[in-house]
Each structure stands twice: as structure tokens, then as C-alpha cells.
């Protein structure tokens, strides 16, 4: 959850607007529906597969867009390219939680997303040995606000847990395909 929270907190501030799909893992939903609004971020929720709802919600300036595809637990699919196009027209950065898509089957950055987050605990580790996450995005984003949040709020892996994740990556392709 640290990856999702850090990725979003690095993009939005008090007075900003976030548009998110409703179809989210429970803790992700709490971040966008309860935690960020307490800090003055306006959150607008839409049904992920419904492009008309995205279009309507993105008719106003927006700082960020967030969705999972496939979503957890409903496995709803969001059109990454279409939502990214709408979001960019509204001035928003697109954050995709690709935990179920995995980098084996889905590469959101190739379809217009700006930032991708993963729960490393699931498919990257594959064994449930490590709690962790990953954030992928432009170097200036990672080196700037993401690094600042990680350094000062603590969601970083130990060297051993990073090594365990590397071991999981060695077999991830085989595991997710079978």
C-alpha cells in the first residue's frame, strides 16, 4: 500500500482533484476516498470500464487519475489508452495499479500511463515472503517527490527483502503464465 500512497501523494496536494475508478482493492479505496480527502484533495469516483463517466469527470482540470486494471477483486478492465488520452487532455498524470496485469501481460506505460505501481508481495515475490511495492515513472518524478516521501516517511525495503524480490523475479514469468 505504500507504493500506491506514495505514488499519489507525490502528485496531489491540498486543493487538487483526483479522479479514480471505484473498482479498487479495499485499502486503495480508503486512500482515495478517505485519506486524501482529509488532506484537502477532492476525489471523484467513476466506474472504471465506463469511458463516458471518465469523460465527464475529466471535463475539469485534474491533477491525477488512478485505477487498477484488472481491478481487485471484480477484475474490471479499464481502457488504459483511452483513459490516458482523456486524462492528459485534462492536465492529469495517469497512475495505474498493474498488480494483476503484471509486467508479463500488461505494460501500461506503453499505452499512455505516466506511472505504474505494483504490490511486490503478490506476483513479483510470488511466495508471500515480502511486503513491498514498486513505483515506475519518469526519472524526475522518482528522484524528486517520490524519493523525498520515501526518505522522510519510511516505506523502503531492507536490502534482504530487495534480494528476495529479485529471486522472485527470476521465476515470475513462468509462474504467472502457468
Can you name each region flagged by the protein language model?
Residues 1-178:
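Conserved PLP-enzyme active-site core in the AAT-like
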Amino acid at each position: 500500500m505504500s507504493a500506491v500512497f506514495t505514488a499519489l501523494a507525490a502528485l496531489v496536494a491540498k486543493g487538487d482533484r483526483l479522479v479514480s475508478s471505484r473498482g479498487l482493492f479495499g485499502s486503495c479505496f480508503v486512500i482515495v476516498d478517505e485519506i486524501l480527502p482529509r488532506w484537502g484533495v477532492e476525489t471523484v469516483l467513476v466506474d472504471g470500464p465506463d469511458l463516458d463517466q471518465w469523460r465527464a469527470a475529466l471535463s475539469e482540470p485534474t491533477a491525477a487519475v488512478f485505477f487498477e486494471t484488472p481491478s481487485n477483486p471484480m477484475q474490471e478492465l479499464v481502457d488504459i489508452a483511452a483513459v490516458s488520452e482523456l486524462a492528459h487532455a485534462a492536465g492529469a498524470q495517469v497512475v495505474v495499479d498493474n498488480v494483476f496485469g503484471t509486467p508479463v501481460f500488461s505494460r501500461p506505460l506503453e499505452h499512455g500511463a505516466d506511472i505504474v505501481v505494483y504490490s511486490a508481495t503478490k506476483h513479483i515475490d510470488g511466495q508471500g515472503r515480502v511486503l513491498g511495492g514498486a513505483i515506475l515513472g519518469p526519472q524526475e518524478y522518482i528522484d524528486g517527490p517520490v524519493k523525498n516521501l520515501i526518505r522522510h516517511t519510511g516505506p523502503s525495503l531492507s536490502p534482504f527483502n530487495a534480494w528476495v524480490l529479485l529471486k522472485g523475479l527470476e521465476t515470475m514469468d513462468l509462474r504467472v503464465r502457468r
